[in-house]
A protein has these predicted regions:
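Short beta-strand edge/turn micro-motifs at domain boundaries
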Residues: 145-175
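Sec/Tat signal peptide C-region and signal peptidase I cleavage site
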Residues: 16-23
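Bacterial N-terminal signal peptides
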Residues: 8-15
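Early exported N-terminus immediately downstream of N-terminal targeting peptides
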Residues: 24-105
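Positively charged n-region of N-terminal signal peptides that target proteins for export
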Residues: 1-4
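Low-complexity, acidic/polar, glycine-enriched regions of mature
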Residues: 136-138, 151, 194
Length: 211
C-alpha cells in the first residue's frame, strides 16, 4: 500500500519541477503553476513515451531534479553514514542517487493515466524554513483519493524553496528508504549502497497499462 502511494506521489512531485516562471520564494505557487505544465507535457508526449518509455528519464532530469534537494534528501537517507563517508564516497553516492531518482521517478511517471490533483490552500509562510503542503491525488477510475504531505525546505541563502520529502499515512519517504537500505549500509557501507543504486538505475522503465 505504501509503495503504491509513494509511486503515485511522484506524479505530483514531478510537477514541482517545471515552473521556470514560478515564484521560487513561494512553494505554493511553484506547486500550482508547475503541476499544470508537467501534466500537459505528459499528455502531449504520450506517443513518444509509448515508443520509448525511457524518455521519461529525460523528462525527470530536465523538469524535476533541478527543483528537488537531491543532496539534502540523499544525506538524510544515509543518516550517520554520511558523516563517516569520505568526500570521494559522497560524490560517488550522490551521482548514483541522482541516477536512481531518474529511474524511480521515471517509472512513477509511467503510471500516469489521467490522475488529477488538488493542492491545499495557501497559508502564510512567516519565518518558516520547513513547510508541509497537502496534496490530494484523485484517480479517474474511482480509486479512493490519496492524501500526501510534501515537505518543502527553504534555502536560507537563495530564499528558494525545494521539495525533499513526502509523507503518506504518516510514513516519510526518507524514513522508508532509510529502513529499506539500513541492512545494506550496515553490512557493506556507503559503497555497497552506491553499487546497488547504480544497478537499480539501469533497469528499464516499463509502462503501466492499467486503465
Amino acid at each position: 500500500m505504501i509503495k503504491r502511494m509513494l509511486m503515485v506521489a511522484m506524479l505530483v512531485i514531478a510537477p514541482l519541477a517545471t515552473a521556470v516562471a514560478a515564484d521560487m520564494s513561494n512553494p505554493y505557487q511553484v506547486m500550482n503553476e508547475a503541476a499544470k505544465k508537467t501534466f500537459d507535457r505528459l499528455k502531449r508526449e504520450q506517443p513518444q513515451i509509448r515508443q520509448n518509455p525511457d524518455h521519461l528519464r529525460d523528462v525527470v532530469d530536465q523538469e524535476l531534479l533541478p527543483y528537488v534537494q537531491v543532496k539534502y534528501a540523499g544525506a538524510l537517507v544515509l543518516g550517520r553514514y554520511y558523516k563517516e563517508a569520505t568526500p570521494a564516497q559522497r560524490e560517488a553516492y550522490f551521482a548514483a542517487f541522482r541516477e536512481y531518482l531518474k529511474q524511480a521517478y521515471g517509472q512513477a511517471l509511467a503510471m500516469y493515466h489521467g490522475q488529477t490533483y488538488q493542492v491545499a490552500p495557501e497559508k502564510p509562510l512567516g519565518d518558516a524554513t520547513i513547510v508541509p503542503i497537502r496534496v490530494t491525488i484523485i484517480d479517474p477510475n474511482g480509486r479512493p483519493p490519496v492524501r500526501l504531505d510534501f515537505q518543502w525546505r527553504k534555502n536560507t541563502q537563495s530564499g528558494n524553496w525545494q521539495a525533499y520529502d513526502m509523507i503518506a499515512e504518516g510514513v516519510s519517504m526518507i524514513t522508508t528508504k532509510q529502513n529499506e537500505w539500513s541492512d545494506l549500509l550496515r553490512t557493506k557501507g556507503i559503497d555497497g549502497l552506491t553499487e546497488q543504486l547504480k544497478s537499480i538505475s539501469k533497469q528499464k522503465i516499463t509502462l503501466d497499462e492499467k486503465k
